[in-house]
């Protein structure tokens, strides 16, 4: 949350307006796509989603490409989801890819709704679903 006052307690509308504008221009897009049902194939797809996201001028955040490298999805599922939610807080939008929504994706979408993030849906062929 952005404070409207400076560290001395005085109103600081210029800093507040500048920080608010920067946050609104957030270029991070959280990539929400299947992982667990077929990790090898889904990681390949997520890499394509990354490229697409970059081509649209966004910076992709795809936790399912990071955390499985050093954590066990099955053993540490709850911890992984909490870290995913923290990364989602940093993003301006949630981009959902694929033709089916998994339970993990449902949780990420629900969290994005709670955070009032913009959510965009895409097919596996990168067509936006409106």
Predicted regions span which residues?
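Catalytic phosphate/metal-binding cores of nucleic-acid and nucleotide-processing enzymes, i.e., regions
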Residues: 1-130
């Amino acid at each position: 949350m952005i404070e409207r006052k400076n560290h001395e307690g005085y109103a600081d509308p210029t800093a507040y307006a500048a920080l608010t504008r920067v946050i609104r221009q957030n270029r991070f897009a959280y990539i929400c796509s299947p992982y667990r049902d077929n990790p090898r194939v889904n990681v390949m797809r997520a890499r394509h989603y990354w490229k697409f996201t970059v081509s649209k001028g966004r910076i992709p955040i795809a936790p399912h490409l990071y955390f499985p490298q050093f954590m066990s999805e099955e053993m540490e599922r709850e911890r992984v989801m909490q870290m995913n939610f923290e990364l989602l807080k940093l993003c301006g939008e949630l981009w959902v890819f694929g033709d089916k929504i998994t339970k993990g994706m449902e949780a990420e979408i629900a969290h994005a709704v709670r955070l009032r993030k913009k959510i965009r849906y895409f097919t596996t062929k990168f067509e936006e679903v409106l």
